[in-house]
Amino acid sequence: MKRRSLFPVVIAMLAVLSCASATAAQTPAEKEAARVATREKLRALLAASGPKKGIEISFRQSDKNPFNFVAMKRGGMPNTEAFEVVVGISNDDTIGFRIYPIYKGTYVNVDKARNSVGLMRKLLNLSDHNFLFWGADDTGDVFAGYTFTLESGFPDKAIEIVLYSIAPLDQYVGQMRPFVDGPAAQ
């Protein structure tokens, strides 16, 4: 009698699991629609949060990639002329920030630095001590970054925290300057 009473429970569990796996697998069209919906949520969030005091960044959709938003953060920073901010939505349900410091009219680049090894060590050390991680892209340009997964929904408050964290990155560019310019730079 106990065996018969477990049979319906097992069947019900298998049915639930098969439905869950069927809903998790998206068709390419559904995946693209979800990515477009995420882009529109991100567009609205950047439009609402960008003008706020402490953020003060005006984003626009990239001409090169329709799933990227770009902006320049300028003013009030003693070590950088600006930060170029790129916010992108990937094919893999993530939103990524790449924040490039503009120093002396150009990107900070590990290959062009006077002390490339020292700069790379500094980037690794900053990644250990900062909210945002530091890295270099395929061309050697240095950036601060953060990546959100969308598994638990759209992270609107967390994205705003990253936006508030952009201007304070200037202090870390100041710590990189001796490696970029050489030991006499301060």
Where are each of the predicted segments found?
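A short acidic-to-branched-hydrophobic micro-motif
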Residues: 79-108
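Bacterial N-terminal signal peptides
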Residues: 9-18
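A short, solvent-exposed beta-edge/loop patch
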Residues: 124-173
